[in-house]
């Protein structure tokens, strides 16, 4: 999801 990546990068990608 959008909050999965560090500092809401790109859908955890």
From Swiss-Prot:
Q: Name one GO cellular component term.
A: extracellular region
List the top taxonomic levels of the source: Eukaryota, Metazoa, Ecdysozoa, Arthropoda, Myriapoda
Q: Which family does it belong to?
A: Belongs to the scolopendra toxin 1 family.
Q: What is its main location?
A: secreted
Q: Does the keyword Iron apply?
A: no
Cleaved signal peptide residues: none
| Record-given protein name | Scolopendra 4511.92 Da toxin
Where are its TM segments located?
none
- Identify the domain of life: Eukaryota
What tissues is it present in?
Expressed by the venom gland.
Cell compartment(s), UniProt: Secreted
Assigned keywords, A-Z? Neurotoxin, Secreted, Toxin
An MF annotation (GO) of this entry: toxin activity
């Amino acid at each position: 999801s959008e909050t999965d990546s560090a500092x809401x990068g790109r859908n955890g990608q």
